Amino acid sequence: GPAQPTYPGDDAPVEDLVRFYDNLQQYLNVVTRHRY
């Protein structure tokens, strides 16, 4: 399966945080889709 995105850190730029949460949402969608 896909690799889980790594949290960029609290001091990361906002763009990195936004990208992380976007990737995390896609990751969770893929993971939950394959689980059922």
Curated annotation (Swiss-Prot):
Modification sites for Tyrosine amide: Y36
Any GO BP: feeding behavior
Keyword Transcription regulation found: no
A Pfam family hit: Hormone_3
Gene Ontology CC annotation, any one: extracellular space
Record localization: Secreted
Keywords: Amidation, Hormone, Secreted
Segment forming the signal sequence: none
Molecular function terms from GO: neuropeptide hormone activity; neuropeptide Y receptor binding
Family: Belongs to the NPY family.
Summary of the function given for this chain in its UniProt record: Hormone secreted by pancreatic cells that acts as a regulator of pancreatic and gastrointestinal functions.
Protein name as annotated: Pancreatic polypeptide
Organism: Struthio camelus
